[in-house]
Amino acid sequence: MATEEAIIRIPPYHYIHVLDQNSNVSRVEVGPKTYIRQDNERVLFAPVRMVTVPPRHYCIVANPVSRDAQSSVLFDVTGQVRLRHADQEIRLAQDPFPLYPGELLEKDITPLQVVLPNTALHLKALLDFEDKNGDKVMAGDEWLFEGPGTYIPQKEVEVVEIIQATVIKQNQALRLRARKECFDRDGKERVTGEEWLVRSVGAYLPAVFEEVLDLVDAVILTEKTALHLRARQNFKDLRGVAHRTGEEWLVTVQDTEAHVPDVYEEVLGVVPITTLGPRHYCVILDPMGPDGKNQLGQKRVVKGEKSFFLQPGERLERGIQDVYVLSEQQGLLLKALQPLEEGEGEEKVAHQAGDRWLIRGPLEYVPSAKVEVVEERQAIPLDQNEGIYVQDVKTGKVRAVIGSTYMLTQDEVLWEKELPSGVEELLNLGHDPLADRGQKGTAKVLQPSAARNKTRVVSYRVPHNAAVQVYDYRAKRARVVFGPELVSLDPEEQFTVLSLSAGRPKRPHARRALCLLLGPDFFTDVITIETADHARLQLQLAYNWHFELKNRNDPEETAKLFSVPDFVGDACKAIASRVRGAVASVTFDDFHKNSARIIRMAVFGFEMSEDAGPDGALLPRARDRAVFPQNGLVVSSVDVQSVEPVDQRTRDALQRSVQLAIEITTNSQEAAAKHEAQRLEQEARGRLERQKILDQSEAEKARKELLELEAMSMAVESTGNAKAEAESRAEAARIEGEGSVLQAKLKAQALAIETEAELERVKKVREMELIYSRAQLELEVSKAQQLADVEAKKFKEMTEALGPGTIRDLAVAGPEMQVKLLQSLGLKSTLITDGSSPINLFNTAFGLLGLGSDGQPPVQK
C-alpha cells in the first residue's frame, strides 16, 4: 500500500520500493536508514521485511533479476533492474534479500524434501539442460533420485511422484512390468510391456521405467495338494523345463514346497490328492501316457491302497468306488466292452464284446477297464408261500419260482405281472371278506404301506368257507380254490372278479369281490307290491341263503358256483317276482292278516302234504326252502322286516289312526294317574294337619317348662348377687391392708440397702484416691532422683573428658588475652572524671576491644 509520508524510517532487514514519477522507474531502498521522499517520488508500500530463507529451506522467485558473473544486479539504460521474465529462480539458504520491482515470490519458504532410505523421487525433465556433471538432459527424460538424501529442487525438473520400496517376504515375489525399453536392476534388458518376477527377499525399489503390478504370494504345497498350472506362452520355468502355450501340468511338494506362479503361468486351481483305501478302486478316463499326453477315450483302473494326483485332463468315472465284496448270496452281472480273457491257466475264459456273464461270491472283484458292471444281484430269499416271476431273455418264457432262495442267472430278469385295475384295487383293499361283508361300499379302506411289487407272485388268502376261481388264459381252463387256502397265480392266470348287487333296494354292480362266500348268510331287499284292491305296499325282506355243494373235487360242480356272476341280484329278482305275483291275487285285508304265510308260500312254493281235507283231497303246504339249480344257491328262510304303504295319503291316514289310538290310551292313563294323585294328596294333607296339632301341643309343654326355669333362675340370681358383693368388698379391704404393710417393709429395706451401698462406694473412692496419690508422689521422687543422678553423671563425665588442665586454661584465657592486647597497643591513657560518674574499670578493657562483658564479640542481628 502506497504511503504519503515524507520521511520513512526503514528498519534493518526491511526494504521499500520507490517509484520515480518522472522516469517511471522503481528502485529498492534497503534499511537500516531514514529515507526522505522527494516530491517526484512515490513510496509504493510501507517497509516490508526481507525474504529470509533458513537452512534446509528454499523458495521460488518468479521473474528474477539478471545478474552478472560477480552476482551483481544488472540495470538497463533507464536505471530499471533487468528481469528474466517468465522465468523462475530457486533460492536456497542465504542472507535476507529484498524483492526487486517485478519479482514475485511464487512459492513461499518451503522445507527441502528429505528422501528416506528405500524411497525415491520420480523426476522428469521439463526443459533441456546440463546437469552438474556436464551431461545433457533432454526434455521428457525421467530418472530417480534415490534416498537417503536431501533433494535440491531445480526449475527444469518436475517431481512426478514419490516411489516407496516394496518389501518382499519369504514365499513372495514382486510382479513388474516395463513401461518402455530399459534394463532392470540385474542389468537384463526388458522390452515395453514385458513382465517378470523379482524373487529376492528384502526391500525392492522399482526403477523409473518399472511398474509394480502386484505382490504374488506363493502357494504352499503339502503332501495332499498339488498346483494345477497352464502356460500362457512358450517359456522355461526355474527348473529349466520348457513349456508350450496351453500346456498344463502339476507342481507337487516333490518339486517345491512353495511355488510362486510365474508371469507366464496361469493357476487353474489346487488339486487334492486322491487316496484309495484297501477296499477302494477308481477308473481314470483319458489317462496320461508315458509321453505326457492324454490318451483320449482310454481307461485305466487303479486299485488301492494308493495315493496319487489326477493329472491335467484326467477325470474319475463315478469317483472313488468300493471294491465289490460278494458273499455267497451275491453276484455281479458283467458285460464285456471289448474282447478279453479272464482267469488263469486252464480256467482262462475268452469273452467277446457284448457278452454277459454272472460271477458269484464269496470273492472280492475289481472290474477291469474292458468290463462293465451291469448290476449287483442279490439272492432273493423266498418262503414256502412266496415266489417271483422270472423271464428268460433269450426264449422269452416266463415262469414262477416259489418256495426257495433264488438268484437270477445272466439270461434271466424279473418279470412284472400286470393285473387289471379292479383286481389291483381289491388286492390293496384292507377289508376282510367275512368280517366286512356287511359294510356299504368300500368303507374301511386301508392305504397300503407300499405299492405292490409286480415281480412277486400274486397271492390271495381265501377265507374259510369261501371259494376263488382262477382262469388260465394260455391253457384256457379254470380252477376253483376253496378256503382256507393261499392261492398263487401263475404268469398266465387271472382272478375271476364277482360283480354283485348291493343296497336296499338292490343295485347291480354295487359290490365287487374276488372270493365267493359259501354261506350261510343273509341279504336284505326292498320290493314294492300291489294287492288286488290296488293297495301299494313296500316290503323289506331278509333271506337266509347258502350254497349247496355235494362234491368239491368235481370240476363241473365247482364251476357251477361261478356260473352266475351276480347271484345276489338274480336271486332277489326271482324272489321279488314270485312275491308280486302272489300278492296281486289277494286283497289288502287278506294280505294284512296272512302276510307271512302268503310271502313264505310265494318264495318257497308249496307241495302236497299227506293230510287230506274234508273232501278227501290232499292239502298243499309250503316248502321249507328254495333252490336255484344254476349255481346251487339255497334260500332257507325269509323274514318280513317291515310293511309300509307306498301311497302318502294312505300312510298319513294310517299314522293318524295310530296316533289317535295312542292319544286315547294316553288320556285314559293320564286320568287314572290324576285321580290316584289326588287321592294320595288328600291322605298326605290329613297326615300333615295331624302332625301340626301334635307339634303345637309339644311346643306348649316346652314353653311351660321354660317359664318355670326362668323364674327359678331369677330368684337364685338375686340372692347370689348380694352375697357375692359383700364377700368381694371384705376381701378387697383385707388385700389392701396387707399390701400397705408389705409396701412399708419393702421401702425400709430398700433405704437401708441404698445407704450401705453409698457408704461402701465413698469408702472405695477414698481408698483409690489415696493409692493414686501415693503412687504419683513415689513416681515424682523417683524421677527427681534419676534426673539428679543423670546431671551428676553428665558433669562428672564432662570434667573427666576435658581434664583439669583444659578447665584451667578456659578459666584464665579471657584475662590473659586482654592483658596481652593492651600490652600490644602500648597506650598510656589518662582518665579525668568527677565522682558523679563512676567508672567500672574492670570492663574498660572489654569496651576498648569492642567485646561484651562476657568477653564475646556482639552478635550481628
From Swiss-Prot:
Its annotated compartments are: Cytoplasm; Nucleus
Q: Which UniProt keywords apply?
A: Acetylation, Cytoplasm, Isopeptide bond, Nucleus, Phosphoprotein, Repeat, Ribonucleoprotein, Ubl conjugation
Tell me where it mainly resides.
cytoplasm
Q: Where is this cross-link: Glycyl lysine isopeptide (Lys-Gly) (interchain with G-Cter in SUMO2)?
A: K444, K704
User: Which superkingdom?
Assistant: Eukaryota
Residues modified as Phosphoserine: S421
Molecular function via GO: identical protein binding; protein kinase binding; protein phosphatase binding
Q: Which CDD domains match?
A: MVP_shoulder
Q: Name one GO biological process term.
A: ERBB signaling pathway
- Pfam families given in the database record: MVP_shoulder, Vault, Vault_2, Vault_3, Vault_4
Give me the Gene Ontology terms describing cellular component.
Answer: cytoskeleton; cytosol; nucleus; perinuclear region of cytoplasm; ribonucleoprotein complex
Anything noted about its domains? MVP 3 mediates interaction with PTEN. MVP 4 mediates interaction with PARP4.
Cited function: Required for normal vault structure. Vaults are multi-subunit structures that may act as scaffolds for proteins involved in signal transduction. Vaults may also play a role in nucleo-cytoplasmic transport. Down-regulates IFNG-mediated STAT1 signaling and subsequent activation of JAK. Down-regulates SRC activity and signaling through MAP kinases.
The protein's name in its UniProt record: Major vault protein
